[in-house]
Amino acid sequence: MAVVLRGGITGGFLHHRRDASSVITRRISSVKAAGGGINPTVAVERATWLPGLNPPPYLDGNLAGDYGFDPLGLGEDPESLKWYVQAELVHSRFAMLGVAGILFTDLLRTTGIRNLPVWYEAGAVKFDFASTKTLIVVQFLLMGFAETKRYMDFVSPGSQAKEGSFFFGLEAALEGLEPGYPGGPLLNPLGLAKDVQNAHDWKLKEIKNGRLAMMAMLGFFVQASVTHTGPIDNLVEHLSNPWHKTIIQTLFTSTS
């Protein structure tokens, strides 16, 4: 996942925990030199994923969630860095939707409210209103259109909000100022990030939750492969015997 490589790992590994507004603090003191000139001294304090780490120069802290984590140097090329930023953002959003959907449907299934399949078997369900082939074709068309428009906005920022960009008259509702954040009343109905001062805070919250969701999805994959049950089932089993029903014992049991 390019996501983790670009931005870093949040949580307990951070050197300093701060709000986005104080991720980078600059203190400039001016001292008069003997000749009457001004000698500025700049001290820059960065939150990093590892104490004492010197972040690479291309990760200067301006990106949301940038804690200087790029051991492979994938973002050294500016154009590649732009692409990885968008890749992380999209994967984060899909992961957040996926985690929420899995937990919600699993809760309905385990409580008996709805007769639903466990999440990793949902793709095998047959629907009466359409065949599997029809659903695949429809998904290709809809997702293909959306992803094509997103890529075009990445190549030419703001182009999809212009009149005549073939968006069924919704161009005015896509007034975002940068790729990945189309904004407007369609995708930002509450206007949460219209305030420039708070926009970075919302971006940081989104990327932190997105990274957490991607780790959760990875956990769901491993969980399903090892236990062949859903996350709610595993949680209930763990709570029934917290000292003996843990991830470590489960992994050792499955390998023995």
Curated annotation (Swiss-Prot):
Disulfide bonds: none annotated. It holds the Pfam family Chloroa_b-bind. Chlorophyll a 6 binds at residue 238. Residues 1-32 form a transit peptide. Binds at least 14 chlorophylls (8 Chl-a and 6 Chl-b) and carotenoids such as lutein and neoxanthin. SUPFAM superfamilies: Chlorophyll a-b binding protein. Chlorophyll a 1 binds at residues 69, 88, 211. GO terms for molecular function: chlorophyll binding; metal ion binding; pigment binding; protein homodimerization activity. This is Photosystem I chlorophyll a/b-binding protein 5, chloroplastic. The lineage of its organism: Eukaryota, Viridiplantae, Streptophyta, Embryophyta, Tracheophyta. The gene is LHCA5.
